[in-house]
């Protein structure tokens, strides 16, 4: 089976996961910006960082997929992937980006990444600061697990990358 790993990463955690996955599976790995035609592949594994409710690089991957090319989507974000509310938010983000008929036959996995505020672009720092100030004083019952995590990690560097979390994905593509 001819397979390819594609990753869309802004600050590096998604790239780290994709490259480690490539080592574990011995599959080739490319940045989403390099994607052209994927119709020659039996399956594509797309690792995408979650940014502002979107999976980075997924739109380009979806446009390049062949009619019979299988798809596995791996999201990487700051939110706790064991929290059901966070998972529902991620699934909703995917539904906004990918057609339902495609998602029905796509395996989806979620990994926890990290953030280092010192490395954020000016635009992303401004967005995160605005978001932080809009949620920090919300009543506790209105805060989601995602907003709590953002408040706790604001202006710091955190790294939740856990390569052991790749094991179920490795098994799924063998």
Which sequence ranges carry the predicted segments?
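N-terminal beta1-alpha1-beta2 submodule of the flavodoxin-like/Rossmannoid cofactor-binding fold
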Residues: 1-67, 73, 171
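FMN-binding flavodoxin-like domain, especially the glycine-rich phosphate-binding loop
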Residues: 53-174
């Amino acid at each position: 089976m001819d397979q390819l790993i594609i990753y869309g990463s802004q600050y590096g955690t998604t790239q780290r996961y994709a490259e480690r996955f490539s080592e574990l599976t011995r599959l080739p790995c490319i940045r989403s910006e390099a994607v052209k035609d994927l119709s020659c592949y039996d399956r594509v594994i797309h690792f995408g960082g979650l940014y502002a409710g979107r999976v980075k690089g997924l739109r380009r991957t979806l446009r390049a997929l062949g009619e019979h090319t299988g798809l596995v989507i791996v999201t990487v974000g700051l939110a706790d992937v064991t929290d059901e509310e966070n998972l529902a938010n991620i699934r909703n983000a995917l539904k906004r980006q990918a057609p339902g008929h495609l998602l029905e036959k796509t395996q989806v996995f979620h990994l926890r990444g990290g953030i280092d505020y010192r490395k954020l672009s000016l635009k992303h720092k401004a967005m995160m600061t605005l978001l932080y100030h809009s949620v920090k004083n919300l009543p506790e019952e209105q805060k989601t697990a995602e907003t709590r995590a953002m408040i706790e990690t604001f202006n710091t560097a955190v790294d939740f990358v856990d390569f052991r979390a790749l094991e179920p994905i490795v098994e799924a593509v063998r």
